[in-house]
Each structure stands twice: as C-alpha cells, then as structure tokens.
Amino acid sequence: MSFLGTPYSNGATRAMLLGSGELGKEVAIELQRLGVEVIAVDRYANAPAMQVAHRSHVISMLDGEALSQLVQQEKPHFIIPEIEAIATETLQKLEQEGFNVVPTALATRLTMDREGIRRLAAETLKLPTSPYFFAETEAEYQQAVEQIGFPCVIKPVMSSSGKGQSVVRKADQVAVAWQYAQEGGRAGRGRVIVEGFVPFDYEITLLTVSAVDGIHFCAPIGHRQEDGDYRESWQPQVMSDALLEKSQHVAREVVKALGGYGLFGVELFIKGDEVYFSEVSPRPHDTGMVTLISQDMSEFALHVRAILGLPIGKITQYGPAASAVVLREGNSTDIRYGNLPAALAQIPGAQLRLFGKPEIAGRRRLGVALVRAENVELAIEQAKQVAAAVDVKF
C-alpha cells in the first residue's frame, strides 16, 4: 500500500483476522504497532486476538454466507486467515471481487487440508515426501495401511494442534487410529491421510517470508512433539550448510508455488543427507513463538511487514533460544495464573506470554515461556523450568 491510514478514520487501513487464537493475537499486536485497524473474528467470544483488536465478531467461518456478509460489511483491505477451518471457496470468490486474501485464496485452499498441499508438493513440484495414501472410508483406510505398512502415521486431512493424529505400529491399533482421526478432524468425520513413518533424525520448521524485497529465511527451528502437538521449540537447530541449502530450496519452491506475500511455516523432516517435505502453513507457526525472544523481528512482525508490502531486509537472530508451552488440563471459565514472580526470577531474562484464553475444557495450551541461554540445551531446560513454575488455578 502507498499509505497506511489511522484507525477509525475515513482513511483507515483495515485488516480482518479469521481466527483469533494466540497466534492471531500476536499478529493483531503487530498490526496495531503500525496503526492498522484490526477486526478479529472467531467462532467463540473473547478469543485472545479479540482482546487486543479494535472490534470483533463471532461467526462460524465455515459458513460461507455469514463470512461473505461480514467481509462486505467491514470491507477490510486485508483478509488474514489464521486457522484452517474456513470456507475457502468463499475466500476465492471474495478475492475475485477484489479483496486481498493473505497470502492468496489459492494458498489458503491448498493448505486448509493435507491433501491439497501434499499433492502440490509431491505430484506437482516433485519434492521428496513420505509415501502416502488418502482414504475416504474405513475400508479404503485399511487398504492404505496395508499398502504403507507399519509403522505409519494417521492424520485427518483437516485438523490442527495435533488433533486426531496418531502413529500406528501394529494391527490392533488400526481401528482405534481411524476413530481417533474421525473425532479429531476440524470439520467432523472425513478423509484421512495415511503416511509412511519417516525415521527422521530431527524435524524443523523453516519460517520463510515472501515479501516485496524477495524471499527470506529465518534460522531453522527445532521442536519436540508430543501427542501431535509441540511442547518445546528452539532456534537455531544445528544442521550442515548442505542440509540447510536443501531445506531452503524445498521451502522456496513451495512458497513460490503458493504465491502472495506473508510468512509461511514450512515443516521438514531431516534424515541423513535428505530433506523431506511434511507440511506448510501460510501463516505464523506455533513452533515459531520462540522468535518472540530469538530474533529482532518475530515471525508475527515479519508476517505483518510482508502483508503490508514493507521490505524485510536483514533478519537478526540473537543466538540460542527456546520456548516451552504452559500446558494444563482441567475445566473452567475462570483461569488464574500465580507464582509468576518466582517463575520469572529463577531464570534471568526469561519472558512469559499468557494467551488469555477464556476457558479450558480438557488439555489446552495457555501460555509459553521464552528463554535465551548459552546453548540450546540449556535454553530448553530453563524454558521448561519457567513454564512448569506457573501456578494455574481453575
């Protein structure tokens, strides 16, 4: 854009967030820093990003008619999807009408489910991936498992935060994994992907920025997953120059194919001298929350700069850093956090982000601890120490 306006004025620059969780909250804050009028949307009230937006709306974003009516009402200059469960056909129609969908409506459609992006990467771009089959019915699923063999990974084609994902290692786990995948899909029961298990040495998130001044890469981020969801992430992940170059090549090809401006979280498996494409999100990635302390520009700041057509320039990484999630289990609409002075005082320079989620029902990520240290291993342990010390009361 040639100019950025002032909120609530006739010339305001308006951005609509579709999805208002903790990642959307940080995007909203970065938009606010540049004077953008922020409209936060989600399926429930008082979502984290709504708490820092100029105004908010509660709708089902899978309801294409409701979504279209809201966009026509607000007339945002930028529509910024922050989750997968959105009526992507509606976004494509809105883009055709002249609305700016970030990064593109095509990218949102292809990445809203694992089938679109896997077919793009493996079949169109010919990038290395694990072997895979898609299944619509339980019979197709069982046949796919037989063809892939054990161990294999089962995922709903549309889910987030590890929901519905499992590793099947023997025959008596097959039926259970199917049911778990059906329960964990974002849109309810539906297709699954059956993947061959890659016995990787490690996995990384390569945050890749497509901006007016070209494609930029953050230092690779390592992470540990448990039950399909990340628990700790760290930057930089140590890897050879050759592997980093291969990783950047894969990420560049995927991002170029998806098009548009913004930050992309490209997930890759590293095995020996090989790099395998796993998934990509056309938006900030949960493992990238470590960049809130590890870089001069966080993934959220980079996303916003790219969206607004601002140059990225040089990304400065400060050295070994880690994040550890504050994960708790319970049921409450009155969540309180204690022992914060002690939690932070034990590690000089430690930081904490509490997401402000309005309720917990079961297991939920409520915050993240952030630490810089002399080495990655120490940063991970210290971040876990801070996260564990937070006293969450329901």
UniProtKB/Swiss-Prot annotation:
Pathway as given in its UniProt record: Purine metabolism; IMP biosynthesis via de novo pathway; N(2)-formyl-N(1)-(5-phospho-D-ribosyl)glycinamide from N(1)-(5-phospho-D-ribosyl)glycinamide (formate route): step 1/1
Family: Belongs to the PurK/PurT family.
Function per UniProt: Involved in the de novo purine biosynthesis. Catalyzes the transfer of formate to 5-phospho-ribosyl-glycinamide (GAR), producing 5-phospho-ribosyl-N-formylglycinamide (FGAR). Formate is provided by PurU via hydrolysis of 10-formyl-tetrahydrofolate.
GO CC annotations, alphabetized: cytosol
Organism, as annotated: Tolumonas auensis (strain DSM 9187 / NBRC 110442 / TA 4)
Domain of life: Bacteria
Any GO MF annotation of the entry: magnesium ion binding
InterPro entries: ATP-grasp (IPR011761), ATP-grasp_carboxylate-amine (IPR003135), ATP_grasp_subdomain_1 (IPR013815), PreATP-grasp_dom_sf (IPR016185), PurT (IPR005862), PurT/PurK_preATP-grasp (IPR054350), PurT_C (IPR048740), Rudment_hybrid_motif (IPR011054)
Protein name: Formate-dependent phosphoribosylglycinamide formyltransferase
Keywords: ATP-binding, Ligase, Magnesium, Metal-binding, Nucleotide-binding, Purine biosynthesis
Domain ATP-grasp as annotated: residue spans: 119-308
Residues the entry annotates as binding ATP: 114, 155, 160-165, 195-198, 203
Sites where the protein binds Mg(2+): 267, 279
EC number: 6.3.1.21
Assembly notes: Homodimer.
Gene Ontology biological process terms in this record: 'de novo' IMP biosynthetic process
Reaction equations catalysed: N(1)-(5-phospho-beta-D-ribosyl)glycinamide + formate + ATP = N(2)-formyl-N(1)-(5-phospho-beta-D-ribosyl)glycinamide + ADP + phosphate + H(+)
Binding site for N(1)-(5-phospho-beta-D-ribosyl)glycinamide: 22-23, 82, 286, 357, 364-365
Taxonomic placement: Bacteria, Pseudomonadati, Pseudomonadota, Gammaproteobacteria, Aeromonadales
